[in-house]
């Protein structure tokens, strides 16, 4: 018969092995998380930035392949996030993927549906809105982890508290602010009047504006692009206005690449249509279509999607301008 002290030692040893196994499992998840979704600080590191996981999509020229594979990749990342919910990199990565998918493969195709398919279009818009909000909330949780209480303060409705919590953000947070703000603003654009979401749009725009203050050239002016579209579409009561839209677009043109077709489409869609500027509209779309996707290998997907949008706008020009 084994001595009681031996049994105790065996039990303690087994417990240590179990704890070690749990620790190793956590370590493995943490290591995998860091590899697939570096912390937001990684955007300041050129080496880590070059290893951005979204490159497998942004460098792809087969839209169907991306549309079919992105949901699976998204769910893999979401499963990893369930195992490591406090990982800021994973929170941001899942948020980005939801917002990218909603924009490229839910909302945008719905915009191309004919008028007699308005029910299908509205269903797609409703789905896109939900995905935008889900993505924004995931990305927001990254900021909440970095700054406990961030969500409460940023949506408090108190201007002073909003400015105070945003003042804590640094250049490291610009990417996260961009995706949170973009997700909420995109959802707002698809939100029926009278819903509760407009109450959050002011905070979302403030996050985007804070991102511009901290890093105006981020992603070749990506934040200015979103703000241009928002300012042009939103009434002044929600912080919009054409004067602000034109100012944001000036910043965008300062930072964007000459091989970026999207800023031409933003100009045509957001600035030319409201002012009935048909000549500017046509010229901008022609410039967008003249760009060779192969000249932008790191952003080929965006070029192809943007040019598809440009062709649709040209084909429906009579819907936007008075004769």
Curated annotation (Swiss-Prot):
Q: Where does this protein have coiled-coil stretches?
A: none
InterPro entries given in the database record: TatT, TatT_sf
Q: Which domain of life is it from?
A: Bacteria
This chain belongs to the protein called: Uncharacterized protein TP_0956
Q: Upper lineage ranks?
A: Bacteria, Pseudomonadati, Spirochaetota, Spirochaetia, Spirochaetales
């Amino acid at each position: 018969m084994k001595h009681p002290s031996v049994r105790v030692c065996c039990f303690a040893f087994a417990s240590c092995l179990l704890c070690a196994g749990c620790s190793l499992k956590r370590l493995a998840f943490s290591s995998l998380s860091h590899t697939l979704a570096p912390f937001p600080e990684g955007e300041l590191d050129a080496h880590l930035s070059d290893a951005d996981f979204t490159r497998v999509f942004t460098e792809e020229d087969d839209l169907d392949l991306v549309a079919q594979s992105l949901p699976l990749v998204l769910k893999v990342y979401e499963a990893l996030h369930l195992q490591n919910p406090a990982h800021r990199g994973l929170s941001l990565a899942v948020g980005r993927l939801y917002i990218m998918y909603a924009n490229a493969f839910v909302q945008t195709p719905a915009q191309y549906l004919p008028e007699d398919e308005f029910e299908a279009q509205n269903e797609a818009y409703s789905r896109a809105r939900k995905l935008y909000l889900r993505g924004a909330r995931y990305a927001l949780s990254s900021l909440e982890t970095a700054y406990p209480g961030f969500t409460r303060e940023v949506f408090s409705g108190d201007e002073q508290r909003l400015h105070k919590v945003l003042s804590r953000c640094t250049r490291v947070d610009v990417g996260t602010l961009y995706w949170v703000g973009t997700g909420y603003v995109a959802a707002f654009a698809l939100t029926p009047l009278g819903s509760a979401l407009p109450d959050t749009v002011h905070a979302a725009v403030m996050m985007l504006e804070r991102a511009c203050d901290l890093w105006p050239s981020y992603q070749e002016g990506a934040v200015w692009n979103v703000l241009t579209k928002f300012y042009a579409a939103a009434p002044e009561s929600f912080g919009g206005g054409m004067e602000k839209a034109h100012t944001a677009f000036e910043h965008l043109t300062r930072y964007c690449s000459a091989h970026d077709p999207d800023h031409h489409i933003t100009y045509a869609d957001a600035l030319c249509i409201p002012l009935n500027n048909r000549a500017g509209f046509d010229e901008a779309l022609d410039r967008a279509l003249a760009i060779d996707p192969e000249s932008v290998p790191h952003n080929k997907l965006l070029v192809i999607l943007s040019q598809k949008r440009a062709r649709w706008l040209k084909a429906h020009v009579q819907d936007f301008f008075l004769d």
